[in-house]
Amino acid sequence: MSQKRTDEPAPTKAAPSEVGTVLAQRYEVVRELGRGGMGVVYLCKDVGTGDRVALKRLRIPEDKAETRDEESFWFHQEARAVASLDHPAIVRARDFGQLADGTPYLVMDVLPGRSVHEWMHTTKMAWSVIWALVEQVLAGLGHAHARGVIHGDLKPSNVMLDLASPKGPRAYILDLGLAWLRHPHHDSRLDGAPAPEGSMHSGAGTVGWVAPEQIRRAAALVGPSTDLYALGCIMYRVLVGREVFEGSAQDVLRAHKRTPVPALELPAEVPVGVSGFVQKLLAKKPWHRFEYAADARRAWEAFRPKDQPTFEEAMAMTPRFSPRVAPASSRPALGHVIASGRSLAPGLLGLRQAPLVAREPERAELWQAVREVAVSVPGTDVSRRMIAMIGEAGVGKSRLAEWLYEQVHEQGIMVPLRARYGRIATPLDGVTGAVNNFFGLEGADRTQVEQTLIQRWEVDPKDDGALTWVAATAEWLRPTPPGTTSPLGPSGKRFVVDTPELRWVVIQKVLEHVGHDRPVFLWFDDLHLSSPNTFEMLARLRRATSKLRILAVATARSEALATDLDAALRMEAM
C-alpha cells in the first residue's frame, strides 16, 4: 500500500531525448504528463489520426526488477479493465500493446480539466459542482461495477473535473492501475487456460483514501462498496476541507480501520442530510454502506440543487430505471454517445467486449420481465419468472443475457448471479459457483467460508439457528467427502446435506440472504450441460412460496438439444 501522503504528481517535461520519439510506430511524444514508481504517462500525437492521446507505459526501475512480473500483470489488468468499459464518466482506452523493448503500453483519451486534487487546493467548489461531481462518479462506478471492475484506488488525483464543458461540470474516472476484476470476461473452459485467481495488488490503495477491508487485505470483502468508501473520503475532503483522518501513514491506516468518522462541519449551502450520506459511505463494514453505486445515486438525488440536470439529462441520455420508463432497447448505446469520430487501434480488439447491436425486440421483452418482477409482490406468480433463450452457437444468446445481467446490476434493480456449466463438471459450476462468486469465496477453504458468512450475515454468536444456517451453507458450498465427518468450523455446528429436499431448502435460504430486499437475477449459461438436479431446482423455484423474487434466464444450444433427448425434454418441461 502506498505510504505517501500526497497523491498528485507534478507535471514534468519529458527528457529531451523522448520528445519527438514515435512509440509503437504511431504515437509521437509531445511531453511528459506525469510518472510514478512503475510507469510514466506521455502526451502524444497519434500520427495516424492527428488526435492528442495519453500513452501510459510500464517502466520498472533497475532496483525493483524483481517486481516486473507482478507489475506487468497489473498493467495488463488495467488494460483489460479500461477496455471493458464504455461510459462518459470513465476515461476511454484506444490502444494496447507492447513497445519494441517488450514493455506494455496503454493509450487513452486526453481528458479536459484538472484533477479534483488540483481543484480542491485552488478553488472552493460550489455546491452545484460538488453534487454533479458525486453524481457522475457514482454513474461511472455503477457502470464499472456491473462489468466486474472494482477501481481499488479511487482518490482526488484519479478523478478529472472539467468546469468549462458547455454541458455543465464533467467528471471522469481514470487510472485503473489497481483495478480488481471480479468476473473476467475470459471463459477458461474455451481454451483450457486456468481461471485467474482473485488477488490484491501488494500496494492496493493509497493512504487516506483506502477502505478498511483493503487495509486488512480481506479480499473476499472487496467489492462495489470498497470504491464507495473511497468516494466518501473524497467527499469528506471536498466538503470539510481536510481528510477524514490525519497524521502519520500508520496512524491514518489504523484510524480508517477502527476510529469513528469525525462529524462533518458542512458549509451553509450544503443540505443537512449530506452528512448522513457521507457517514454511510464511510461505514467500517462494507455491508453497512450502500450495496450498489445505483443505491447511493438514488439517495444522492434527494440533494440535487434546483434546476440542476442529472447526468443523463445533460448528456441527452435516457433516465435511469423506474417501473414506468421505456424499455432498455429504446435507450441509445453509451458507445454512440461518446465514440463518434474516434479511431480505435486493433490492439484492444482482444480485450474489448463485443458491443450488443440491434436485438431490440428481444431486449424489450427481457426488460419487460425485469420490470414486472421488480415491482411484483413476493409469493405471487409474477414474482418468479423464467425465460429460456435457445439457438445455435454464436447467435448471441449469452451476450444478450450478459447485457441484461449488466443492466440490472448497473441500475441496482436486482442482485445478479451467473451460473455457468461446462461439458466437464467442476465444483464451481451452477448456482454453487454463482454464490461463491457473489461472496468472493472462490479460493476460500471451509473455515474461511464460515468466517465470511458469519461476518456478512452479522450472526450473533449466541444465535444457534443462524449459526446452523452458516454451517449448512458451508456444507453446500464445500461438501464433506463421502465417508468422512464434516469439520467443526467457526460456527461450532455440523450440518449434513444428504437429500435433494434438504439441499433445496439450503439453496432457497441462501438466495433469500443474497437478495435480501431486492429480486435475484439468475443467469443459467449453457443450461443444456447441467444435471437433472438443476432442472429440479428450477421447478422448485417456480413453485416456491417464500419471499424470494427471482428472474431466471437460461441459455442453451439448439444443436446440443437436438442430439440429447433427455436435455431437450427437461428444457421443454421448464
Show where each model-derived region lies.
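C-terminal lobe helix-coil module of Hanks-type protein kinase domains
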Residues: 45, 135, 160, 208-312
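Key residue(s) within conserved catalytic/signature motifs
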Residues: 153, 175, 270, 290-574
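Activation-segment/catalytic-loop signature of the eukaryotic protein kinase fold
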Residues: 96
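Conserved N-lobe ATP-binding subsite of Hanks-type protein kinase domains
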Residues: 40
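Protein kinase catalytic-loop region centered on the HRD/HxD motif
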Residues: 138-149
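AlphaC helix of the eukaryotic protein kinase fold
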Residues: 59-84
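Conserved short submotifs of the Hanks-type protein kinase catalytic core
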Residues: 101-115, 119
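Hydrophobic/aromatic scaffold residues of ePK-like serine/threonine protein kinase catalytic domains
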Residues: 84, 133-134
